[in-house]
Structures are given as C-alpha cells and as structure tokens.
Amino acid sequence: MAVAPAGGQHAPALEALLGAGALRLLDSSQIVIISTAPDVGAPQVPTGPAAPPAGPRDPDVLLFATPQAPRPAPSAPRPALGRPPVKRRLDLETDHQYLAGSSGPFRGRGRHPGKGVKSPGEKSRYETSLNLTTKRFLELLSHSADGVVDLNWAAEVLKVQKRRIYDITNVLEGIQLIAKKSKNHIQWLGSRTMVGIGQRLEGLTQDLQQLQESEQQLDHLMHICTTQLQLLSEDSDIQRLAYVTCQDLRSIADPAEQMVIVIKAPPETQLQAVDSAETFQISLKSKQGPIDVFLCPEESAEGISPGRTSYQETSGEDRNADSGTAGPPPSPPSTSPTLDPSQSLLGLEQEAVLPRIGNLRAPMEEDRLSPLVAADSLLEHVKEDFSGLLPGEFISLSPPHEAVDYHFGLEEGEGIRDLFDCDFGDLTPLDF
C-alpha cells in the first residue's frame, strides 16, 4: 500500500481514517490524494486507475483507491500457513469512476462496396460444386473406349483439384460402379452389372403377372363366399333350414320307436345331458371345430331297397331273438320339404350298414386265424384248382430257399431268363 509521505497537510487526516478503519484496503492497494491547493512539500504521486471514494469526502480533498469486489464473510478462520496469494476481480463497468465518454451512436462497419460484385474470371458456387464435377467426370468415362480413365488427365481436363476427383472415385468404387486398375487409373464397371438384366426383368414380370392372377382368383373366391354367407344369413327360406328342430325329427319317425343318432364331434367336446321323465336333452359344445350329427331312422318294409332285402331276410331271426323289447313295425315316415337336405345325406348304403339297436348290442364274434403255411403247399393247391386251364404244370420262377441267401446279379449281356434254371422255350403261349 502506497501512502503519501508524512509532512503533507493531508497526511494526518489520512492516517486518522486508516486508524479508525473507515477504509478497507489491501496491501497492494494504491491511494491517490488529489487536493485543490498544491502541496509543495509533498512529492507528486503517480495517478493510476481510480474508484469511488471509500471514506468521508472533503470538498478540498478527494481520495481514490483501486476498486475491490465485496468479499464474502469467512466461514471459518484459515490456518496461518504463510501469506496467501491475493485474488482480485475488477468489475470496471459498475465500480470504476472513470467512464469513457460517449463518442456518439455505435455504427457497424460498412459493407465493402466491391464485395458483392464478382470479378469476371471468378467461378460461381455451382460451377465448383461436387455435383457438377461428378457429372463431368461421368461424361469422361462415357467417352472412354474401354472405360479406363487416368485421374491425372481427368483433373487437368476438368480443371479441378485431384482430391475432388478422389472424392468422386471413392463413392463410385463403394457402390461397385468403378474399379481401380492401377494407382491413378480406374475402369467403369456399370456395363457389367447390366448383363442379364433383361432376363431378370422378364422373369420378374412373369412372376408379378402370376401373383396378380392369383390375387384376382382369391378375390373372386372371397366374393363368392361372402355372397353365400349373406344368402345363408339373410334369406328367410334358407334360415328355417339352418337348424333341425324337434318337430322335424317327429315328422321323420314315430316318437315311440327307437332312433339312432350318430354324433361326430372333435376332441374336448363338452356334453351335457338332461334326463327327465318326459324329455331327454343333450347339449354339445365344442371350440375345436364343427359337430356333425346324423340321424339313422328305421324304415318300413315297403321302403326297403333291393340292396337291403337280402340283409333283412338273413338277419330276421336274429332280430326276433333280441331282448323282446321291439315294438310294432314303424309307420312310414312322413316326408317334409324342410328335411330334404338331411335325408339326402342318408344314402341307402349307410342305412344298410347300420342294423337295429339289438344287433349292435350283440357280442362280436372273434375270427380265428389259421397259421401261415409254406408257399409250396399253397402252390400244390393252386395246381389242383387250375389243372384244367394250363397244359403243363406250374414252373416255380424263384429258386428254392437256401440256408445262405445271396444277391442276384446280371451281366450286361444277360436278361431276366438267366435268373431261373429253366427253359422257357418249351412253354406254350397263353390264349385268352
């Protein structure tokens, strides 16, 4: 801290201010005393940067000190480890007293009068762009006889830097349109990629046409299915044929007679039966697929088809030998126009296969199978049965069975006759 030497008339006042603690100064602060009356005895102090007065102000004496930022209150006393370095931050915009005088409104730097005007020899931005350079380079490739271009020659012709040519060739090489022949020579490969493109295009066109035809066919089938579903769900004449009611069953057969109902249901079908004194109901529910129900009613003797006559005549005694619960012969079923589709499903062959319920309860007889016999014994029986058809005896075409099997083989000049030890020339031709 620099203070005016003693002997000046203002030195006691300054020392009193410093002793009272009215001024907060650092060791490196500089104090400048400006007085209206010149002090001959005091040496002149060099003036420096000044700040607002930090103490009481006298009309004849002005004290200025270096501006200091407000220091925060110390949280804890620091240990005395020597003299710590002093850090200062000058805020000249707020604390400094001397402000530069305004020199008028700020004016930006004027535009150079000749900056927007280009010289006649200067190229435009589009002329130096990489897009135009690439087009011109491809023109050079197209005019080349074998597709080989020297990059040094191309840079001279196009009047561009060689690195611009390298930027173009790196991209074209990455998409496999050119290939490097040497350090500064490249070759165009675009014509090779077009080989066979016509055949591929023709094949893809045919595939596309087939897919379009298949799509049209599927659309036509979907339209037919949609129309049929609408007819089934909206037509009143068809809606009454969608279900078979109890009245339809009673119109087919006499309720007093026994009827056989065959149910064909997918796995995991839920069945619920309600048994009462008057009615017997069965409810079926399946989530795996549709449930098919077939009705097999008994027919009267008048409606027996010729194909079933022999079966009923031969099994008449077995039917009479049943448990004796058979009732009177059923009356012929009355025809109903609503059940024509269901009746058409029951063909004569299906009815002939299904006998009465009593026959279904009969135990099945076990078939006794005879043991297998040798082929020679069967051949003897066949010879006895067909002895009058052929003039001679049968000739065994296969060799006799031996203990050790072997594989048959033929040479190039042999045929099937060489596999058998017999003379086929003695056989007479068969006349049919």
From Swiss-Prot:
UniProt GO molecular function = cis-regulatory region sequence-specific DNA binding; DNA binding; DNA-binding transcription activator activity; DNA-binding transcription factor activity; DNA-binding transcription factor activity, RNA polymerase II-specific; DNA-binding transcription factor binding; molecular adaptor activity; protein dimerization activity
SUPFAM superfamilies per UniProt: E2F-DP heterodimerization region, Winged helix' DNA-binding domain
- Give the motif span (DEF box): 156-192
Q: Which residues carry this modification: N6-methyllysine?
A: K183
User: CDD domains, per this entry?
Assistant: E2F_DD (cd14660)
| Keyword Cell division appears in the UniProt entry | no
CC annotations in GO: centrosome; chromatin; cytoplasm; nuclear chromosome; nucleoplasm; nucleus; protein-containing complex; Rb-E2F complex
The protein's matches in Pfam families, at most eight in alphabetical order, are given as: E2F_CC-MB, E2F_TDP
State any GO BP term from the record.
regulation of G1/S transition of mitotic cell cycle
Ranges for the region named Dimerization are 193-282
Q: Where is this region: Transactivation?
A: 363-432
InterPro entries in UniProt? E2F (IPR015633), E2F-DP_heterodim (IPR037241), E2F_CC-MB (IPR032198), E2F_WHTH_DNA-bd_dom (IPR003316), WH-like_DNA-bd_sf (IPR036388), WH_DNA-bd_sf (IPR036390)
Please list where the region (Leucine-zipper) is annotated: 151-172
Disordered: where is this region? 39-85, 98-126, 297-342
List residues annotated as DNA-binding: 108-192
Q: Which residues carry this modification: Phosphoserine?
A: S370, S398
Quaternary structure (record): Component of the DRTF1/E2F transcription factor complex. Forms heterodimers with DP family members. The E2F1 complex binds specifically hypophosphorylated RB1, the interaction represses E2F1-driven transcription. During the cell cycle, RB1 becomes phosphorylated in mid-to-late G1 phase, detaches from the DRTF1/E2F complex, rendering E2F transcriptionally active. Interacts with TRRAP, which probably mediates its interaction with histone acetyltransferase complexes, leading to transcription activation. Binds TOPBP1 and EAPP. Interacts with ARID3A.
Function of the protein: Transcription activator that binds DNA cooperatively with DP proteins through the E2 recognition site, 5'-TTTC[CG]CGC-3' found in the promoter region of a number of genes whose products are involved in cell cycle regulation or in DNA replication. The DRTF1/E2F complex functions in the control of cell-cycle progression from G1 to S phase. E2F1 binds preferentially RB1 in a cell-cycle dependent manner. It can mediate both cell proliferation and TP53/p53-dependent apoptosis. Blocks adipocyte differentiation by binding to specific promoters repressing CEBPA binding to its target gene promoters.
What is this protein's record name? Transcription factor E2F1
Species of the source: Rattus norvegicus
State the encoding gene. E2f1
